[in-house]
Amino acid sequence: MEVTKLDELCIQTIRFLAIDGVQKANSGHPGMPMGMAPAAYVLWTRLMKHNPANPRWVNRDRFVLSAGHASMLLYSMLHLTGYDMALDDLKNFRQWKSKTPGHPEYDPQLGIEVTTGPLGQGLGNAVGMAIAEKYLASQFNREGFPIVDYKIFVFAGDGCMQEGVTSEASSLAGHLGLDNLIVVYDDNHITIDGKTELSFTEDTARRYKAYGWNVIVIDGDGNDIAAIEKAIQKAKRYKGKPTIIKLRTHIAYGSPNKQDTADAHGSPLGTDEIKLIKQNYGWDGEKTFYVPDEVKEYMLRTKDAGQKAQKKWDRLFKKYSQAHPQLAEQFNVAASGKLGINLDEILPKFKAPGAMATRKASGTVLNALMPRCPLVLGGSADLTPSNNTRFEGAKDFQKDCPEGRYIRFGVREHGMGTILNGINVSGLLRAYGATFLVFSDYMKASIRMASLSKYPSIFIFTHDSIGVGEDGPTHQPIGHFAALRSIPNLLVFRPADANETAQAWKFILENRNGPAAILLTRQDVEIIDQEKYGKAENVSKGAYVVVKADNPDCLLLATGSEVSVAMKACEKLAAEGIRAQVVSMPCWELFEKQDKSYIDSVLPPQVTARVGIEAGVELGWHKWIGSKGIFIGMSSFGASAPAKVCFEKFGITPDKAVEAAKKLLNK
């Protein structure tokens, strides 16, 4: 394929928009956009199936800029190809409430598929997107009707390659043979510190071959668009393996003084350098944010091509609807974001008396729900028997079984988190992943990205306290409740018993407005009698009265397994003539959203004698118990001993709660 002057002009325009945006903001990363402009041009205008007129088209190819610092490259492409990204938006780069923040933030209506920036997150998301496409294709495609057949394209950099999460996600992608995933690796040999040889000398091509990937290497300077197009076309046709294209590029390509230097990575090039670059290409060095008319006209043809592609798909789907009406209806329901079932009809109800670990209750709930929820996937980071996450009759999602709904993530917690986020942004699927709560630390970045972006990801964390017992302090979470609650937009559920667990699942599945974490016990907890005490349905309000007291003397507030501690303490206090009201607080975030009248009905403001009980650190509790309240919990790491002994030795007992209440009441 011959490179035309118009091709060159388009590529130059992409480069110059990117560096002008960074320069105007006096902040940003100009180097990678300059080096990767040819690859972006070829992919977006010739190879990627997308419709700028309808960015949410369900069968579009997905583009993920895993190296999110190169955001001006993405924004420039969105503008030039006709998305809702005006030239003024590029001029507003990195400014307050602009469409163009420093790193891309999830906005599918703008064409931004995922939030990226922390390196490696995007590549992990892309693996999840590829899993979603494979599963959806297995469910809905029929002979002659490939209604789901999109690809996932990723631009990743040297930093992405160094992050551990990239190794986790890439390893699993190779194992699963995700041949719908294509990564273009910007091999520019530069990081913030300097040349990559300072710390990164491995053979990435051989590494990815070992992962089970198809590897294509393009040497040179990153400007051979014919070679790039050929490589991507080959990758699109390749079967059985994901593909990585190792593209040798030069950071800040065309900059006389800063090409191939670390200075070009994360700082503006400077007005003088930009003038030199533009003049060397025959441009007016004084003009900024300039798009030649012929470039504008040519690149906007992408929009026309996208509309034609979608119209072709629409015609196919119309025929599909006639040939397979039931499947088409299911597809449309899924695309609307609805479950399509009444959860109240199938949720299990648990009778008292009895006891059950909430992780086992969660497993029972999944066994009831999953046969009726074919668009929910799940898995575990190699803790399936402990997490109770594999439902009866489940098939594993594997290379030769894309219809499987259970994902074996392996010991890859961080990778699991990023992959879950990728599945959950598909728009049609929900996905959960599980590990021990103490290992949520390994995946914190992915939980944070889900919360920032409001992905409806579901994180199951079992073994949630010193109730872990004999495994000891290495596996007993202490500060994790507080750490998760500190993340904005994350709903943290810690149910008190089996029925609260079922109601937590109901709320999570019915709400797609953001992520949720559900924290579950290893040890058995008593089932609260629904006929005698407060109803578990009130989990949807975040907190509720379990044991009601008229004109209470004190309040006992608790979460999870400690609600039963509070209830036993209440009985002991009643025997001494002290009226205690017990409050279960399974989700603080939901409780905070209730109106004042409801909050005051649960926590009467006139009752200041309050005891908080939770097998974690005190942080955050004084919002509920007040400055004079007493907290019963953990102030140190745990210990290796049976769970019952741990609770006794650390003083999380009914007797200690009684003692605290009496102290507050001066009795």
Question: Each predicted region: which residue ranges?
Answer:
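Non-catalytic terminal/interface segments that mediate subunit docking, oligomerization
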Residues: 315-456, 534-545, 549-552, 557-560, ...
